[in-house]
Amino acid sequence: MPVSARAGIVVTGTEVLTGRVQDANGPWIADRLLELGVELAHITICGDRPHDIEAQLRFLADQGVDLIVTSGGLGPTADDMTVEVVARFCGRELVLDAEVEEKIANILKKLMARNPAIQSALDPGTFESLRAANRKQAMVPAGAQVLDPVGTAPGVVVPGKPAVIVLPGPPRELQPMWHTAIQTPAAQQAIAGRTVYRQEMLRMFGLPESGLAETLREAEAAVPGFGQLEITTCLRRGEIEMVTRYEPTAATAYAQLTKLLRDKHGDQLYSEDGSRVDDLVARLLAGRRIATAESCTAGLLAARLTDRPGSSDYVAGGVVAYSNEAKAELLGVDPALIEAHGAVSEPVAQAMAAGARQRFAADTAVAITGIAGPGGGTEEKPVGTVCFSVQVGPPGATARSDTRTMRLPGNRSDIRERSTTVAMHLLRRLLTDA
């Protein structure tokens, strides 16, 4: 594929470098760049030391990137040095931007006015001390374009070869600034050589990665123009994400590849537009009322269902019934059934789902009971054994159902997370067939 404009990302912060805080900015910025057709050369992470930050900038410049994007290090404290380092790297002086200083002062006033505990800080003398402490954030490289702050930290865009976009660390501040930053003349000039790509994502569940690899090898020979498609795959908790980038002239090749995947793996290919299973389930539950009954997942499925805005329209409620007594008292599971089959069994999962439908007057229910480990497994039911029951039908009436047992790999956290994913897909399939 032709070489496009290239960019590098520098994520700063000792807390990110040491793993205390997970980097959310690098992947997010990378996606935005790829959407624009900009090639991503490197993502680097470094601590707060100025010479380490400058070393990353010089490394990326030596790699010939057209644009560098940094995140973090824009606060008022002594270890927030990114702007100063970028100014030195770009050969520009730091100057006080009076307009930015006034904007920061107004933001501080509003923040303090909303917090009664620090009303005394509005005293003129006290406030001026605070304003002086934040003046550092109004120091910008000469000739840079300033981005209005979302918090108190403004971003800056410094023209040059490479151009540098400097953004704050908190994602809630960085993300709203991105559109303005990338539309600045300096940024647009830097990425002027980008290639226009289309990017598509397919999602599959229940297909081994080796199965997809075999189909892609077949496509290499069967699909004209396959070599013009840039394909990356990622396996996440039993789901495969396949992202394909291509120039518009290769649209026919992508369409033929998608048809081949649909023909060979139609049962596993559940999304051709990148929608997640959670999005699809939310749409399928419109006009319904769902309840959950969970043991080993301890409410994770209910949390996942209610993570979508508007979920109160269809989620009735859920029960976490860890003990056998709770299963009997809260869900009406017959203790004799548990005694005969064990708490981790398909009959108990069915009874839990039926109990949830009845208790919440729901027409849809999902039950999960299993052994997440690390203890509790037996030869007959090892760690990772999980029973599911999904039911669709009015409470008290015979329901359409899908009840099954699966052996899921991984540690306790993996098994619990995979269990919710399996449950979501069983729910999706049953509702799709409704």
Curated annotation (Swiss-Prot):
It comes from the Bacteria. Pfam families: CinA, MoCF_biosynth. InterPro entries: CinA, CinA-like_C, CinA_C, Competence-induced_CinA, MoaB/Mog-like_dom_sf, MoaB/Mog_dom. Belongs to the CinA family. This is CinA-like protein. It comes from Mycolicibacterium paratuberculosis (strain ATCC BAA-968 / K-10) (Mycobacterium paratuberculosis). The lineage of its organism: Bacteria, Bacillati, Actinomycetota, Actinomycetes, Mycobacteriales.
